[in-house]
Every structure is written in C-alpha cells, then in structure tokens.
Amino acid sequence: MKNSSKIFVVLSIILFYVISSCHGYNPFAKTVVTVTNNISPQTTLTISCRSKDDDLGEHLLLHGQAFLWKFRPSWFRTTLFTCKFLWNNNVKWFDTYRSDRDQGHCYSCNWSINADSACISGNFNKKFDRCYPWN
C-alpha cells in the first residue's frame, strides 16, 4: 500500500503539471510585470506598487522609462499587485496584476501608462491593444 500511495501522489503531480502546461499555465514559472511611462514627453511619473505580501517601493519614471518586477503567482489564483500612479495633479490606482484576469494569459505583462488609461500587451504581442480605465 505504501508504494501505491507514493506512485499515486507522483502521478497526480505530473498530471497536474501536464494539464496546467497544456492550458498555458506553468505553476513554477515567474511572471514579469513591466510598467512604462507613456504619458507625455515632459511628464515624470511616480509609481508605487504593492501586493498583500510585498511593497515594491516608490519609483520615479521619466517618459519612456520602465519599472519591472518578477514573482511567482499563487497556485490559488489570489495574487494581486496594485499600483498608485502620480503625475502633475493626478493620482490614479490600477491593478497591474490580477490572477483572475492575468494568470495563464500573461507571463510577461507589459503595461503602457497613459493619461486616460493603462494598456497591456501580453507575452510576445507588441501591440498595446487592451486598455482599461483607471480605478
């Protein structure tokens, strides 16, 4: 019985990994989120991002500059990173990574921050074709 239990556990783990990989989700891979300031050439963007577990600090981005971080999403699809954006007299908030929206769709999440929205191009797509209004 002991050997059959071990074999069952090993086969279950392998099956989970194979099914997850077939659906575009690798539970062991790190996700990269990149946020780029594309507001206007003379605008400096202050960005401050955090999750429940991590505070990534405050960063100043000149036009065209980017800030990125890497992490492993939770297997339970609860990972959430929220960023606060400040420029001129504007203060905006946005979820730059939400497991329910992004996990399995974007391992390299590239955000273009504009004055009226945040736009994403996922993985190898270079077009910022999905835009979301500010929270």
Swiss-Prot record:
It is found in: Secreted. The keyword ATP-binding does not apply. Pfam families: Self-incomp_S1 (PF05938). GO terms for biological process: rejection of self pollen. It comes from the Eukaryota. Keywords: Glycoprotein, Secreted, Self-incompatibility, Signal. Residues 1-24 form the signal peptide. GO terms for cellular component: extracellular region. Belongs to the plant self-incompatibility (S1) protein family. This is S-protein homolog 29.
